[in-house]
Amino acid sequence: MSDALSAIPAAVHRNLSDKLYEKRKNAALELENIVKNLTSSGDHDKISKVIEMLIKEFAKSPQANHRKGGLIGLAAVTVGLSTEAAQYLEQIVPPVINSFSDQDSRVRYYACEALYNIAKVVRGDFIIFFNKIFDALCKLSADSDANVQSAAHLLDRLVKDIVTESDQFSIEEFIPLLKERMNVLNPYVRQFLVGWITVLDSVPDIDMLGFLPDFLDGLFNMLSDSSHEIRQQADSALSEFLQEIKNSPSVDYGRMAEILVQRAASPDEFTRLTAITWINEFVKLGGDQLVRYYADILGAILPCISDKEEKIRVVARETNEELRSIHVEPSDGFDVGAILSVARRQLSSEFEATRIEALNWISTLLNKHRTEVLCFLNDIFDTLLKALSDSSDDVVLLVLEVHAGVAKDPQHFRQLIVFLVHNFRADNSLLERRGALIVRRMCVLLDAERVYRELSTILEGEDNLDFASTMVQALNLILLTSPELSKLRELLKGSLVNREGKELFVALYTSWCHSPMAIISLCLLAQAYQHASVVIQSLVEEDINVKFLVQLDKLIRLLETPIFTYLRLQLLEPGRYTWLLKTLYGLLMLLPQQSAAFKILRTRLKTVPTYSFSTGNQIGRATSGVPFSQYKHQNEDGDLEDDNINSSHQGINFAVRLQQFENVQNLHRGQARTRVNYSYHSSSSSTSKEVRRSEEQQQQQQQQQQQQQQQQRPPPSSTSSSVADNNRPPSRTSRKGPGQLQL
């Protein structure tokens, strides 16, 4: 230390710690000349002693002015060393960097100034301290003192220039440092970081694109910054990187795709738009690299399809179509199960557009990878069934298409119909709201006859009789009114003529027995008029309830529609279709006379021509809907000399059918009685005690009143007593008839 003091005059030593900047500056200039002379003479030991003295007595001094003098002195030494400074940097730079965290803002300012002067001298040799300097500058960029920020900004610009010129800069060592600070929220630090990313990316020899996954998330995080300038800088940097990706032959799409998927769900609109735009480009460019990320990408796209921002919706739809058009196989790593899982989750979305696209994906996978989809059927089947209750008709129609695609296999067809019936049973509102839509669409997508036969088979063994009746009534109404089932109606019209119609009639009859009106409608459709009349005659008082009359009202109105045109035309020949008339009159007799349906049917029957009755015997008693040209080859159910209903026609044993109908109806009647009895007993048991108690109280009151009257009345004579007895109205006892018990 004495060597250092001998080399430095006392005045210089004293002025370095002076409170006046000018004195410190002059002392530093003198120190610079001293070091130059020592360098020229090659006295490296003295130079080291001088540096050591500046650090120990000045830079580390508790006095702020001493620390300021030490910093300016170290800068002066570096300038004096000039080209020889590199070998002393290990001594000079660390204390300057440490001063960046000094509590005194003026010391921090002079530290920036000192390091700036040092960097100007040593240039590229300065790189070995880059990470420490970068860390210090990152903190100084957010310094509370504006002067320190300004000085740090100047130093930062110089360091950037040095780095871009240097071939010693290590991007591999720098990236972890950058990544560690990318999530800092301070706006000044963010500007500092984006500035460095942009500068380094502009250097041809530095491959920032290869390290983009390490700091991409941080850049996206800045897109939602409150500062417009920071958002703009981050967006500019991202746009530049995206352009580089388009022009680069090799990019790590996978790691970045994971980040983009998360950012696509950001609450910030600008961030979502940028993320979905990147995903769109990745899907176009990524190719095989993205196969295993398709499920994650789809999970990000589907919600964006329903985004409130139109730009996001447009890009999301484009990306969705692009992704769906890619042809990949499970052997390439395409995970069908993962895609199905995403689609299943999105079926619960609150947005209709997202649910529709999720169903489109399931349908696409079913067409392209049927075997794999069926392996995961149990995972998605319940969700698909629940979707039948969706509030959107478009969603329901798409769900039915998916179900129809699955039901191409016989075992899945049966399973589908069973589950449909189960859902209708579990949710009564589903049958009311969606029943017609579901059944009609299933009849279009799958064979209508096949669907109705399967439904009939299932309902035939239904234990819940009320549900079976309701379901059959719904199916019957669909059968009578839906354009999609016109071929089925035509087939049933020939039930008495051809085998196919007969088999369908018998298949439906078994379950249609749950509803008298459905059976009557089926017979009218099949032109089995005698059997319809017999069914009407078999009805009892219990069957004619409000529900029955409502169904009858619907049928009467349907008779006036084009569907039953053939039936109305047959009324032109009442002699030939006597059983049809008897059936219609039977329905008329069941209707209340003041009802609209009664008036409609009565008006129709009034139009039946009477002249045909006189020729009825000549035409013959062919009372079915079978064409007369075929009559002599038929034996219609109503065309028997003895009107024997126990005969059969074309294999249809109507006697057995009638017995089957009555058996089912007896079950319904028994259940109705049980329900009424249960309701009666449950209500009477709760009130019987109260009624009994009330009666006892009334009897006690009557006895008390009678006693009071007897006490007040004078004793009667025998004459007056007999007169009074004659004038008194007869008692309940005197009014009892023969064999009547006294109450």
Swiss-Prot record:
Residues 624-647, 670-743 are annotated as: Disordered. Gene3D superfamilies: Leucine-rich Repeat Variant. It comes from Arabidopsis thaliana. Its main location: cytoplasm. It is a peripheral membrane protein. Belongs to the VAC14 family. Residues 678-688, 697-712 have a biased composition (Low complexity). This is Protein VAC14 homolog. GO terms for cellular component: PAS complex. GO terms for biological process: phosphatidylinositol biosynthetic process. InterPro entries: ARM-like (IPR011989), ARM-type_fold (IPR016024), HEAT_type_2 (IPR021133), Vac14 (IPR026825), VAC14_Fig4p-bd (IPR021841). HEAT repeats lie at residues 45-83, 87-124, 128-165, 169-206, 210-247, 251-288, 292-329, 334-371, 375-412, 414-448. Component of the PI(3,5)P2 regulatory complex at least composed of ATG18, SAC/FIG4, FAB1 and VAC14. VAC14 nucleates the assembly of the complex and serves as a scaffold. Residues 718-732 have a biased composition (Polar residues). It comes from the Eukaryota. The PI(3,5)P2 regulatory complex regulates both the synthesis and turnover of phosphatidylinositol 3,5-bisphosphate (PtdIns(3,5)P2). Regulates the synthesis of PtdIns(3,5)P2 by positive activation of FAB1 and by controlling SAC/FIG4 localization. Keywords: Cytoplasm, Membrane, Repeat, Vacuole. It is found in: Cytoplasm; Vacuole membrane.
